[in-house]
């Protein structure tokens, strides 16, 4: 009988019920995959992510944990707004249709979700809570509004957080980001900078790479803030530096375009720079304009020119730098461009300037290139010697740092400072499809929070997307409202929250049955025990979520600082790329068709699956052709979860063959499998029968049936023990390898004489494959007479007595050449071992011609003739 995966999978998907259990012996286990944006279709990356989490959830449930394994939808965002404009539909309707489609797709994979906890962030009963959070953050001083220069995406027509700018481009649109000055709402993530940094070390089950990325993004720097007097103005320029010892090598200062000083110097040149400037500029060009101002050097009788430069960021430190071109690559390039002095001050620095400098200085135009060995941070050491530096001459760098700080503090123009690269999170977005910010602006009362009893502030449905910009800002009625204080006409805030606001707390909403934030439920289920998602979220989502936990704890919602205990960053699903003779990207099926027609195509490298390069495979196609279990097994089989995996049609075929092989094997052995009690309990209680211990002279020959079965039983239980350990440590590909090995082992057993062992092996095997291929496992469970659902059965435990090695394999050599192997009792007496070895090769050697026999216990016997 052939395995009918289509009917089997539908049958069990309609009957599974993964409601959260109560009072489980092992306590809670919260498993969560990063929830998806409802684009309308799942892709292979989704499939891998969700199946990894599903295996963990099913295993933990079998181990007796109260498993929370929810799913929801990160439903706000610009794509819905774009779809509304392009297709003349409401974003809510477009989003709901996509959610319905994707929900059906997820159910077709057989994922063990607590569907009763499903949520969507675009629903008012969800986002009303985050509006309340915002009001509480206001009370706690964690929110403020100010006018600031922001990153403006000209394609998406909205503000981007710095974390959303990648190499000067918008993270979603890819457009070159511009600078604009707007009034924005900010969350004070910097209040928790030190705590966010320190607590990284306690996240023992996070990948080191993720922790390193967050460490660098928070960017703690210990240095000095120096005040430079601006010549001709009664103002001072504050500069933060981690290298005060290079102050005598300074040849210029530079400020960011947003610096307050610049606002007083709005020459046409500076205005042109501001209007055209990009973050770091195209190709990281260092662009600057001389302001016409100079600053006084703190110790020398000279002035340094003050520039406005595009590489200086207002958000970082003081928005100003002093440039030491001899010991900084960026400053060197700027000095070359603007012909500024280059003054070396550290004798053993490995920054080579061409032509060589004899402890003097050159201007930028005289220097043709630099040589940097081993990277900039290694250009000099703390033991390098200072020169060209007045009172620092002859000191080591380490000594010079201390002395220069003391001198600056004595003069009252410098102080030790700790700075962070991290800046406050701007959450205002100029778009419709997002959570409304609950604030009202009144000409009499100023900024007024929406009263809690008036929450939620919901979105209007009668909006116009055809005129561009933010529809809320142009709405004829929604925008206008009476002030809660004076009752005069006022206006709503028309910006909406950054969508990362919603995803920064959704894991807490899942803890409660009604999607609210129940303190007891949150403290009970949080933190998330296993969080699975891509490493691309290492800074944005994960850092914001850590901040939100601290902010919500401060507001009294729960008492959890860290949201995620174990973080699994699954690798990408990759596929070979194809192009036709004209360089046009081809879908794999198109490439296959052209090849069969004899056409020439270009086979490219293996890359992450992407729509743009057409190297995608539709999960629905695989599920329809091979079944959900085949798709699940393939994405888990050959590659550790954290590594990228390559799509392979042969691999999919191999997984399909295994599933059918397992079905046929169990059907073959079905008549001998008798379940008198819970088979899993039967397996767990199995011990070695006394007669199985018997052997002749320590050897287990093939004719000794019970002895042979002892070996099989040991291997099965060792595989069970090993794969259980692999599951505990998320080595899922190793689990697959072990249960495949177990399958082959059971298939070798003689059905006539090994009925009890087959019964035991089949019971173990069906249970351990269930987290991976649950539909087939449930079907096999039913076929062998199992009662109820398999996923509700406990996990089998390997018998400890079967894990002890009392038999070893010994090599038998004749004159140094391997001729046989034998299985003998461990630590067998050497004389017995020698005799067994001679007997095992009796067809190869005449015992009367044996001159000597040498034996190493438990390892080898060498017969010399």
Curated annotation (Swiss-Prot):
One of its GO terms (molecular function) is leucine-tRNA ligase activity. GO terms for cellular component: cytoplasm. The keyword Nucleotide-binding applies. SUPFAM superfamilies: Anticodon-binding domain of a subclass of class I aminoacyl-tRNA synthetases, Nucleotidylyl transferase, ValRS/IleRS/LeuRS editing domain. InterPro entries: aa-tRNA-synth_I_CS, aa-tRNA-synth_Ia, Leu-tRNA-ligase, Leu_tRNA-synth_edit, M/V/L/I-tRNA-synth_anticd-bd, Methionyl/Leucyl_tRNA_Synth, Rossmann-like_a/b/a_fold, tRNAsynth_Ia_anticodon-bd. The keyword Ligase applies. A motif ('KMSKS' region) lies at residues 608-612. Belongs to the class-I aminoacyl-tRNA synthetase family. Gene3D superfamilies: HUPs, Isoleucyl-tRNA Synthetase, Domain 1. GO terms for biological process: leucyl-tRNA aminoacylation. NCBIfam families: leuS_bact (TIGR00396). It is found in: Cytoplasm. Its EC number is 6.1.1.4. It catalyses: tRNA(Leu) + L-leucine + ATP = L-leucyl-tRNA(Leu) + AMP + diphosphate. This is Leucine--tRNA ligase. Keywords: Aminoacyl-tRNA synthetase, ATP-binding, Cytoplasm, Ligase, Nucleotide-binding, Protein biosynthesis. The lineage of its organism: Bacteria, Pseudomonadati, Pseudomonadota, Alphaproteobacteria, Rickettsiales. A motif ('HIGH' region) lies at residues 36-46. It comes from the Bacteria. ATP binds at residue 611.
């Amino acid at each position: 009988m052939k395995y009918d995966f289509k009917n089997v999978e539908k049958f069990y998907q309609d009957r599974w019920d993964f409601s959260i259990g109560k009072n489980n012996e092992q306590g809670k286990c919260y498993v969560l995959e990063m929830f998806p944006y409802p684009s309308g279709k799942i892709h292979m990356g989704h499939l891998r992510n969700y199946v990894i989490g599903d295996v963990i959830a099913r295993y933990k449930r079998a181990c007796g944990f109260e498993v929370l394994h929810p799913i929801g939808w990160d439903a706000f965002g610009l794509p819905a707004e774009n779809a509304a404009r392009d297709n003349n539909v409401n974003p809510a309707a477009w989003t709901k249709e996509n959610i319905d489609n994707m929900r059906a797709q997820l159910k077709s994979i057989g994922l063990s979700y607590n569907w009763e906890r499903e949520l969507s962030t675009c629903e008012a009963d969800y986002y009303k809570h985050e509006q309340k959070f915002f009001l509480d953050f206001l009370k706690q001083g964690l929110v403020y509004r100010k006018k600031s220069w922001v990153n403006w995406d000209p394609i998406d027509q909205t503000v981007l957080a710095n974390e959303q700018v990648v190499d000067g481009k918008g993270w979603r649109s890819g457009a070159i980001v511009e600078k604009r000055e707007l009034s924005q709402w900010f969350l004070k993530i910097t209040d928790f900078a030190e705590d966010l940094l320190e607590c990284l070390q306690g996240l023992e089950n996070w990948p080191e790479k993720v922790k390193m990325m967050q460490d660098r993004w928070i960017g703690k720097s210990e240095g000095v803030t120096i005040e430079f007097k601006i010549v001709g103005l009664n103002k001072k320029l504050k500069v933060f530096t981690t290298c005060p010892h290079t102050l005598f090598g300074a040849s210029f200062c530079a400020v960011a375009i947003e610096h307050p000083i610049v606002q007083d110097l709005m020459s046409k040149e500076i205005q042109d720079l501001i209007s055209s400037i990009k973050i770091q500029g195209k190709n990281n060009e260092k662009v600057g304009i001389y302001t016409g101002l100079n600053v006084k050097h703190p110790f020398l009788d000279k002035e340094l020119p003050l520039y406005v430069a595009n590489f200086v960021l207002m958000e970082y430190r003081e928005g100003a730098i002093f440039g030491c071109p001899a010991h900084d690559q960026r400053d060197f390039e700027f000095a070359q461009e603007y012909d500024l002095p280059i003054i070396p001050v550290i004798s053993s620095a490995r920054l080579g300037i061409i032509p060589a400098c004899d402890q003097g200085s050159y201007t930028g135009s005289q220097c043709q290139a630099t040589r940097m060995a081993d990277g900039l941070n290694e250009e000099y050491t703390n033991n390098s010697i200072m020169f060209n530096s007045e009172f620092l001459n002859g000191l080591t760098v380490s000594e010079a740092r201390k002395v220069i700080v003391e001198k600056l503090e004595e003069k009252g123009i410098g102080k030790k400072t700790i700075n962070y690269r991290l800046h406050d999170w701007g959450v205002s977005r100029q778009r419709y499809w997002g959570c409304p910010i609950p604030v009202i602006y009144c000409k009499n009362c100023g900024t007024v929070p929406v009263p809690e009893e008036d929450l939620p502030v919901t979105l209007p449905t009668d909006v116009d997307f055809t005129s561009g910009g933010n529809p809320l800002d142009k709405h004829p009625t929604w925008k206008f409202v009476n002030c809660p204080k004076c009752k005069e006409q006022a206006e709503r805030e028309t910006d909406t929250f950054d969508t990362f606001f919603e995803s920064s707390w959704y894991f807490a909403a899942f803890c409660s049955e009604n999607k609210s934030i129940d303190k007891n439920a949150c403290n009970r289920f949080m933190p998330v025990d296993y969080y699975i998602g891509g490493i691309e979220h290492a800074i944005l989502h994960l850092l914001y979520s850590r901040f939100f936990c601290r902010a919500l704890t401060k507001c009294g919602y729960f008492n959890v600082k860290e949201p995620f205990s174990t973080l699994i960053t699954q690798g990408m699903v990759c596929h070979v790329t194809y192009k036709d003779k004209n360089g046009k990207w081809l879908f794999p099926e198109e490439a296959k068709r052209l090849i069969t027609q004899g056409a020439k195509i270009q086979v490219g490298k293996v890359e992450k699956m992407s729509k743009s390069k057409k190297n995608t495979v539709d999960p629905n196609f695989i599920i329809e052709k091979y079944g959900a279990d085949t798709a699940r097994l393939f994405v888990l089989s050959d590659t550790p979860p954290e590594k990228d995996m390559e799509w392979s049609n042969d691999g999919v075929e191999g997984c399909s063959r295994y599933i059918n092989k397992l079905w046929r094997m169990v059907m073959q052995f079905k008549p001998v499998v008798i379940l008198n009690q819970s088979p899993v309990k039967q397996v767990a209680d199995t011990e070695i029968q006394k007669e199985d211990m018997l052997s002749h002279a320590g050897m287990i020959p093939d004719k000794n049936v019970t002895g042979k079965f002892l070996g099989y039983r040991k291997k099965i239980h060792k595989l069970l023990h090993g794969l259980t350990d692999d599951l505990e440590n998320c080595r899922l590909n190793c689990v697959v390898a072990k249960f495949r090995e177990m399958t082959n082992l059971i298939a070798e057993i003689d059905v006539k004489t090994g009925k009890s062992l087959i019964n035991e092996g089949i019971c173990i095997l069906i249970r351990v494959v269930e987290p991976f291929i649950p539909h087939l496992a449930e079907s096999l469970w039913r076929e062998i007479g199992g009662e109820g659902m398999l996923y509700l059965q406990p996990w089998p435990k390997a018998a400890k007595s079967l894990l002890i090695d009392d038999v070893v394999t010994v090599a038998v050599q004749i004159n140094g050449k391997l001729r046989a192997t034998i299985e003998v009792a461990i630590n067998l007496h050497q004389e017995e071992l020698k005799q067994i070895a001679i007997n095992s090769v009796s067809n190869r050697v005449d015992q009367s011609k044996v001159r000597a026999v040498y034996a190493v216990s438990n390892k080898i016997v060498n017969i010399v003739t």
